[in-house]
Amino acid sequence: MSQWKDICKIDDILPETGVCALLGDEQVAIFRPYHSDQVFAISNIDPFFESSVLSRGLIAEHQGELWVASPLKKQRFRLSDGLCMEDEQFSVKHYEARVKDGVVQLRG
């Protein structure tokens, strides 16, 4: 079973933003959508352009679904599972994320 890996302190991520981190050799976009300890993690790679940009995308909520819009062409990816809301064949990898004792952790 995979271990939880410490990534950063929750206070290192401003509310309503995302950051990029390395988990092994994979770039992961970690999002903190609210002023709370809730975090989400998906691949940082935009599958439409194979660019490392999703962590800089715009976080929004629609009909109870949190998503991030790619800064390139604005395709939306659900934070809960990485599903591309415009075209499911371009979904991105989702990572288990949590905050424990003020530290953001990813399962890897």
Curated annotation (Swiss-Prot):
One of its GO terms (cellular component) is cytoplasm. It is found in: Cytoplasm. It catalyses: NH4(+) + 3 NAD(+) + 2 H2O = nitrite + 3 NADH + 5 H(+). The keyword Oxidoreductase applies. One of its GO terms (molecular function) is nitrite reductase NADH activity. Pfam families: Rieske_2 (PF13806). InterPro entries: NirD (IPR017881), Rieske-like_NirD (IPR012748), Rieske_2Fe-2S_sf (IPR036922). Its EC number is 1.7.1.15. Associates with NirB. To B.subtilis NasE. This is Nitrite reductase (NADH) small subunit.
